[in-house]
């Protein structure tokens, strides 16, 4: 007698295959593995430096130090999971307005939710979640940076030729990104995040090659150079008087401008952390004092693991460590821009350029603030500063970029 064999139902097979694909945490074969390796290096380096920089804040409290490191590891794992998930699941052709609009609404709702929580450093930009012995904070404005990039890609990429009027072309992205900027700057009072989002949007807006956009792009370019020149003038001794006339800035923001010009005017107040950071830079030398051997982190340096972590990096690893960190950032930006220059898909190019600018603008604002070249904005050093929102957000953004790169290398987009 022939043995009866059970037939596997096609539906069950399809379901199991889909489940394996959904839970797949490996990067696509067609993704850029060098970019992936650079992200892992930054992720591990960030965990190590957060642990080192937090020793001073812990003040011998080993429990606090362990909790801080564990939180950073959890954030890194969550970010890595988001990166691999999006690298496998994100598709440009499925970037449709209906789905994206729901994400936009959720982002705006979370931004408004921050207003219910207490103010920190002059801004209401965080959602605080008590979790046993610690507290988890989320900053929705970090995730809004991804949304801002996708909004420009959705409405200005590839399909813009169907519009007959110039304003019809930009009204939707202008409105959505305008609402995000309004909430972050006016309602949350988070000038640093607003500035980062604004610069990213402006650069992404310059990417599409469309006749009806060129007039707006020229105006935007002129305004950009004008703002840069005005900034240089304000931060010069002759332009210092203009700072006091900026009524749209809060008192603490005006003090940051003044501290950037001369931190010794308030060396025990707003200028204290900047002076401490500059001392760390000066004492680091070429090769630093060694990992974990920073002296300044044991002084009153509360932002040592966040805004000023670069000062601890330079003090412990020296100028060589600083150049090495810049090299990793530079490599990531180079890879993203190289693929953006190669491909014709404007949606893909906008996403890649936006992700590159995400890295570049954060680098500029953080390094500039720590060294006193520009006022401190509270913008973290991506993947290195303590905090989960910026780490998870940038890794998710790189995951989307890797999906675009993989599609390009497979020939699915040009």
Explain the meaning of each model-derived region:
Residues 39-55:
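Alpha-helical transmembrane segments of multi-pass membrane proteins
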Residues 195, 201-215, 295-321, 380-392:
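Interfacial segments of multi-pass membrane proteins
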Residues 216-319:
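Hydrophobic, glycine- and aromatic-enriched re-entrant/interface helices and adjoining loop segments
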Residues 338-377:
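Loop-to-helix entry and N-terminal half of a specific, functionally important transmembrane alpha helix
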Residues 82-93, 152-161, 202-213, 235-236, ...:
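Structural signal for the C-terminal ends of transmembrane alpha-helices
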Residues 100-101, 171-183, 192-245:
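Hydrophobic alpha-helical segments of polytopic membrane proteins
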């Amino acid at each position: 007698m022939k043995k009866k064999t059970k037939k596997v139902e096609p539906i069950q097979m399809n379901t199991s295959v889909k489940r394996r694909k959904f839970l797949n945490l490996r990067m696509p074969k067609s993704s850029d593995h060098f970019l992936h390796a650079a992200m892992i290096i930054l992720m591990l380096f960030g965990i190590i430096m957060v642990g080192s920089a937090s020793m001073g804040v812990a003040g011998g409290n080993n429990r606090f130090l362990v909790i801080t490191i564990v939180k950073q590891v959890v954030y890194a794992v969550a970010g890595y999971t988001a990166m691999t998930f999006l690298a496998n699941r994100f598709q440009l052709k499925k970037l449709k307005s209906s789905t994206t609009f729901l994400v936009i609404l959720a982002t705006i709702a979370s931004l408004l939710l921050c207003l219910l929580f207490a103010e920190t450093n002059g801004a209401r930009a965080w959602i605080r979640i008590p979790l046993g012995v610690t507290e988890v904070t989320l900053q929705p404005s970090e995730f809004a940076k991804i949304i801002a990039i996708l909004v420009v890609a959705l409405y200005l990429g590839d399909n813009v030729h169907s519009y007959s009027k110039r304003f019809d072309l930009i009204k939707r992205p202008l409105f959505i990104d305008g609402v995000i900027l309004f909430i972050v700057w006016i309602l949350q009072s988070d000038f640093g995040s607003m500035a980062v989002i604004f610069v990213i949007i402006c650069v992404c807006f310059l990417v599409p090659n469309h006749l009806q956009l060129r007039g707006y792009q020229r105006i935007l370019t002129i305004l950009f150079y004008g703002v840069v020149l005005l900034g240089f003038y304000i931060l010069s001794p002759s332009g210092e008087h203009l700072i006091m006339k900026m009524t749209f800035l809060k008192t603490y923001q005006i003090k940051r401008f003044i501290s950037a010009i001369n931190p010794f005017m308030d060396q025990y107040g707003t200028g204290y952390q900047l002076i401490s950071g500059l001392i760390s830079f000066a004492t680091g030398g070429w090769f630093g004092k060694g990992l974990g051997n920073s002296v300044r982190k044991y002084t009153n340096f509360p932002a040592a693991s966040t805004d000023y972590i670069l000062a601890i990096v330079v003090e412990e690893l020296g100028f060589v460590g600083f150049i090495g960190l810049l090299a990793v950032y530079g490599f990531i930006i180079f890879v993203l821009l190289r693929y953006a220059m190669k491909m014709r898909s404007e949606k893909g190019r906008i996403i890649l350029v936006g992700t590159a600018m995400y890295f570049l603008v954060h680098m500029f604002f953080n390094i500039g603030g720590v060294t006193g070249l520009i006022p401190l904005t509270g913008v973290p050093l991506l993947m290195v500063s303590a905090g989960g929102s910026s780490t998870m957000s940038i890794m998710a953004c790189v995951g989307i970029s890797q999906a675009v790169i993989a599609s390009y290398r497979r020939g699915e987009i040009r």
